[in-house]
Amino acid sequence: MKQFLDFLPLVVFFAFYKLYDIYAATSALIVATAIVLIYSWVRYRKIEKMALITFVLVAVFGGLTLFFHNDEFIKWKVTVIYALFAGALLISQWVMKKPLIQRMLGKELALPQQVWSKLNLAWALFFIACGLANIYIAFWLPQNIWVNFKVFGLTALTLIFTLLSGVYIYRHLPQEDKS
């Protein structure tokens, strides 16, 4: 259910873009993200930091898009989110004692420190690459291609990278955890 909720605003954005335009899609994205946030609070009595940050960025960049009637703001939102994710991962890698990935998954998985560090760095580089790809596609290709890339391309890339991360983790699990 939670994964469905995470993707709901993206599906709403895509549907409104196909039915109307980027501005209707942006409005729908803001509303859908707010509804998901409210639902999460009512249902789980908890709002994850990432969801709150995403909502704030959607509201700010979406609001600027609507206020100035300029789609460049909503296009930048994707890169800003990826830059924040990459930055958080890199700061945790080089400044804090534990990589962020380890903080998120370390209770469920026993992995060597080197594996956590490599996984954390790999995700940071992945987010940087996605942010750069978004800049190129958003500002040098037609809007409809960017929307398709945002909805399908980035989602597919994230799924593939998640699967590859799972394979990498599995290879480094202690034997007793693999069963």
Swiss-Prot record:
The keyword Translocase does not apply. It is found in: Cell inner membrane. Keywords: Cell inner membrane, Cell membrane, Membrane, Transmembrane, Transmembrane helix. Pfam families: IspA. It is a multi-pass membrane protein. It comes from the Bacteria. Its main location: membrane. The keyword Glycosyltransferase does not apply. The chain crosses the membrane at residues 22-42, 50-70, 76-96, 121-141, 149-169. One of its GO terms (cellular component) is plasma membrane. InterPro entries: YciB. HAMAP family: YciB. Belongs to the YciB family. NCBIfam families: ispZ, PRK00259.1-2, PRK00259.1-3, PRK00259.1-4. Plays a role in cell envelope biogenesis, maintenance of cell envelope integrity and membrane homeostasis. PANTHER family: INNER MEMBRANE-SPANNING PROTEIN YCIB, INTRACELLULAR SEPTATION PROTEIN A-RELATED. This is Inner membrane-spanning protein YciB. The gene is yciB.
